């Protein structure tokens, strides 16, 4: 708003995540990469990602698995030769936690604000290959090791076991940022500032 010369106070808090006991564990890693969600995602990048890993698109609840935007983008899969992408229907919370603890996530975002998948990956220490948008950097930090700038770089990072372990450990250091306690304290601070 500053660049528009609008003098309006704005408060900021990070989206919190309720704790999750199931964390990514490299010893259980199944060499699979998953795509989660559909809003402002570039599905084509996921389908074009060159990897030996099993690729899985989590379709989510019925209401968005049948959304025209989602369906149009899922049809992009057929344009790519030898695409080993599998589709999973909506998962229970238990099964979602399980797949997150044994996989790496890949997203190519057109834009984002407070992205649930980013927060869920921090909470579970699940490495997420993601393009470094400003709003993503607010959550993952500028030194996050699993940012990519091209699909070739993403594919290369996906094959680096040490980097995957390092990324999971790095995400542990970001968990305080999304804690419920921090959210409540920050929200209280923001409300005090505007009252």
Spans of features found by a protein language model:
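Conserved catalytic-core segment of nucleotide-activated headgroup transferases in glycan assembly
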Residues: 21, 27-93
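Donor nucleotide-sugar binding/catalytic pocket of nucleotide-sugar-dependent glycosyltransferases
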Residues: 1-23
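Short alpha-helical donor nucleotide-sugar binding micro-motif in glycosyltransferases
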Residues: 90-103, 121
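Acidic donor-binding loop of glycosyltransferase active sites
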Residues: 98-113, 126
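Short glycine-rich donor-binding/catalytic loop of glycosyltransferases
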Residues: 111, 126, 130-140
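Conserved acidic donor-binding segment of nucleotide-sugar-dependent glycosyltransferases
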Residues: 142-152, 157-162
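Short alpha-helical segment that forms part of, or immediately flanks, the ligand-binding pocket
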Residues: 97, 115-123, 134-137
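A charged, aromatic-enriched C-terminal amphipathic alpha-helix characteristic of glycosyltransferases
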Residues: 152, 162-195
């Amino acid at each position: 708003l500053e660049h528009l010369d609008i003098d309006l106070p704005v408060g900021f808090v990070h989206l919190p995540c309720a704790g999750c006991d199931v964390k990514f564990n490299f010893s259980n890693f199944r060499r699979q990469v998953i795509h989660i969600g559909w809003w402002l995602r570039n599905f084509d990048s996921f389908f074009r990602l060159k990897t030996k890993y099993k690729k899985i698109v989590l379709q989510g609840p019925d209401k968005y698995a049948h959304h025209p935007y989602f369906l149009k983008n899922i049809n992009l899969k057929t344009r790519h030769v030898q695409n080993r992408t599998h589709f999973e229907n909506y998962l229970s919370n238990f099964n979602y936690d399980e797949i997150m603890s044994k996989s790496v996530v890949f997203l190519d975002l057109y834009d984002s604000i407070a992205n649930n998948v980013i927060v869920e990956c921090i909470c579970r220490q699940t490495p997420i290959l993601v393009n470094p948008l400003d709003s993503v950097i607010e959550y993952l930090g500028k030194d996050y090791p699993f940012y990519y700038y091209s699909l070739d770089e993403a594919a290369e990072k996906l094959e680096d076991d040490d980097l995957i372990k390092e990324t999971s450990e790095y995400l542990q250091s970001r968990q305080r940022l999304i804690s419920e306690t921090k959210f409540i304290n920050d929200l209280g601070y923001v409300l005090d500032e505007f009252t």
